[in-house]
């Protein structure tokens, strides 16, 4: 029997609103920190299917979320495309060779690096209650390309943004390679047991309006189209963080089934500009749940009220902060669970 989250993504509006949180499996949980300390590095944890299964299940056991999102990372795709991937303490991810300097042809694809992720999905699906929806995910091509070009994360994505103007053909080739492998990757996740997938475009907001169509809308549309050609029942949540006024163009142009709002979007405005009946996910500010208190509860109720007339999945506007107290999450869960349309 499909769960509440899956029903909502299929455009059913229920009395109760389903709930999950971006980065719900992670460092704010003491059980995660304990497992991470035993296992060592982040990447080792991701590629250890038994450990990754356990991390994925930890927030489900503790909070009873309606969705379990695969514990992995968006940079698994460039790793499978042949870049060396390291997570350095205090520095974040590093990819080499950086494609600002090297050519894409210098990379040798290693698709078998994805096999451990598929095994994690299989193990999680086998362990989950049937009514808990299993979510897979991948990074969207623009966001993944920003890391591949720069070799690391950056505040302004300057390397990739500059390449979009100075060598758009090279950037297009990188994006096309990401699209190809991402479609394969998402098909593999669905075949292993994922019931819906989310495309994270964390740096969509860094592009000028005339660049947004080419590097955000078109690549995501290609993934959605090809994924649905391969798996017609696939459900896709799009998350164009920072899209702002371009949100409606993204919704219309990509073909995603549902759209996730970041915390800067007024949900009442989103309700007026998005297609009727389209499920919306979001969008409490991660810093508001970090702060907690009555203000968090009131804002949560305001978001629920603003989206009461369409299918709504409650979530944050981005990933939960690692310092968020468990008690604040528990209070959020209680607030959403006790709210009715």
Swiss-Prot record:
GO BP: any one term: protoporphyrinogen IX biosynthetic process from glutamate
Statement: the UniProt record of this protein carries the keyword Cytoplasm: yes
Reactions that this protein is recorded to catalyse: uroporphyrinogen III + 4 H(+) = coproporphyrinogen III + 4 CO2
Keyword check for Zinc: no
Documented EC number(s): 4.1.1.37
Subcellular location: Cytoplasm
GO cellular component: cytosol
Residues holding substrate: 23-27, 73, 147, 202, 318
Predominant location category: cytoplasm
Protein keywords: Cytoplasm, Decarboxylase, Lyase, Porphyrin biosynthesis
GO molecular function, one term: uroporphyrinogen decarboxylase activity
Pathway recorded for this protein: Porphyrin-containing compound metabolism; protoporphyrin-IX biosynthesis; coproporphyrinogen-III from 5-aminolevulinate: step 4/4
Self-association and partners: Homodimer.
Family listed: Belongs to the uroporphyrinogen decarboxylase family.
Function description: Catalyzes the decarboxylation of four acetate groups of uroporphyrinogen-III to yield coproporphyrinogen-III.
Alphabetized PANTHER family for the sequence: METHYLTETRAHYDROFOLATE:HOMOCYSTEINE METHYLTRANSFERASE RELATED, UROPORPHYRINOGEN DECARBOXYLASE
Protein name: Uroporphyrinogen decarboxylase
Source species of the chain: Erythrobacter litoralis (strain HTCC2594)
Organism lineage: Bacteria, Pseudomonadati, Pseudomonadota, Alphaproteobacteria, Sphingomonadales
